[in-house]
């Protein structure tokens, strides 16, 4: 959805920081959009990337960090969010394995501009397939409504996106 914003913050060739341990569905959509993945090693005790290692891995081409909290063990999201704000890098959460987990009294899956949850049969909440996306960005919200409905805009309030682009 970040690609479809009016002022797209991502371009083909931009760099995304990702953990070396995740699921293929975390990586493939990023590759399909032409983004370059920069893998960061995880700590063997937490199975997560440390915020410091992620910080060191960032370059001038880094535009997005995909934080993945593994097995209910949150990444250092508070540090990452602060770092991202300072460096003007987008933070996105893959929270498919940590529904209900908290980091400093805040639920995981609420720190990023886009936050994903899976309802695949092996996850915390199962609908056999599917998922949930959370965002507090109004434009992304409306884009998601459109994507969910194969491009139909009838659910968008006042045809939000059409009016903005005319």
Feature locations, PLM:
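Phosphate-binding glycine-rich loop
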Residues: 1-15, 29-33, 39-41
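Proline-centered loop/turn at the N-terminus of a beta-strand
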Residues: 15, 36, 63, 88-90, ...
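Hydrophobic residues in well-ordered beta-strands that form the structural core
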Residues: 18, 39, 91-93, 117
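Conserved coil-to-alpha-helix start sites within the AMP-binding
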Residues: 21-27
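Aromatic/hydrophobic pocket-lining residues that form π-stacking "cages" and hydrophobic walls in ligand
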Residues: 26, 80, 144
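Catalytic PLP-binding core of fold-type I/II PLP enzymes
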Residues: 51-66, 72-105, 137
């Amino acid at each position: 959805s970040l690609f479809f914003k009016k002022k797209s913050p991502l371009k083909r060739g931009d760099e995304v920081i990702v953990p070396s341990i995740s699921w293929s569905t975390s990586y493939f959509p990023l590759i399909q959009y032409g983004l370059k993945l920069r893998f960061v090693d995880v700590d063997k005790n937490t199975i997560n990337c440390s915020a410091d290692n992620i910080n060191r891995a960032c370059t001038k081409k880094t535009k997005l960090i995909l934080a993945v909290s593994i097995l209910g063990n949150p990444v250092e999201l508070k540090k990452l969010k602060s770092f991202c704000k300072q460096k003007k890098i987008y933070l996105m959460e893959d929270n498919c394995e940590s529904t209900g987990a908290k980091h400093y009294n805040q639920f995981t899956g609420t720190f990023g501009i886009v936050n994903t949850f899976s309802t695949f049969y092996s996850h915390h909440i199962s609908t056999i397939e599917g998922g949930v996306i959370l965002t507090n960005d109004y434009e992304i919200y409306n884009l998601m409504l459109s994507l969910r409905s194969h491009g139909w805009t009838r659910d968008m309030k006042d045809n939000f996106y059409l009016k903005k682009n005319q």
